[in-house]
């Protein structure tokens, strides 16, 4: 374990993860001394660790991100097992994004949204403005060609955005954030997957009781049985966890 400013780092499978105690700790860390940190936020769960193990390009993308945090309960439990004194809790990416947007609205921080279907993105913008008065300085749905990427990066740079959130799924969103940072480096980037869909009610999230019990994965599996193949991959992660191969 090493210290990273006001938050410790815990290594799993060679990747250093930030150990936030709770959401308040996460926000205070990202807005330390009234200055929003710059870099890339990546949510880490068991599935992402497995993918990083098998795909060198994904591992390089994740390793390059400054702020890797424990999004999955299995990752939190592994940290606690490997580091018994760790005071770390799960900070779900969807919850962190909402908290970040609420804080951005309060601070007047300019935000640029990328990804999602056009109608979902429009609803996300409207709800963010209504709910937290978020200063959205630009947006782009997820339907653009590779040839349009540089124009998008130029728009983001011209907007002066300090927070850029990208909902395209992994590893597409990590690739886009990496490339955009070459044009617009002075911002906090966050990959958010399907968060816009959840935020606007198009996708139902597990009830709070399931989340609090660490069973959100089971709720998703019961709601979407086709996920069983993906979930079977996690048996490998369980072996890592219980044999201490972390």
Swiss-Prot record:
EC number(s) recorded for this UniProt protein: 2.4.1.180
Enzyme class, spelled out: transferase
Pfam families (alphabetical): Glyco_tran_WecG (PF03808)
GO biological process, one term: enterobacterial common antigen biosynthetic process
InterPro entries, per the entry: UDP-ManNAcA_Trfase_WecG (IPR023085), WecG_TagA_CpsF (IPR004629)
Keyword annotations: Glycosyltransferase, Transferase
Pathway(s) the chain acts in: Bacterial outer membrane biogenesis; enterobacterial common antigen biosynthesis
Family assignment from sequence similarity: Belongs to the glycosyltransferase 26 family.
NCBIfam families xrefs: PRK03692.1, wecG_tagA_cpsF
Cross-referenced HAMAP family: WecG_RffM
Entry function: Catalyzes the synthesis of Und-PP-GlcNAc-ManNAcA (Lipid II), the second lipid-linked intermediate involved in enterobacterial common antigen (ECA) synthesis.
Protein known as: UDP-N-acetyl-D-mannosaminuronic acid transferase
Organism expressing this protein natively: Salmonella heidelberg (strain SL476)
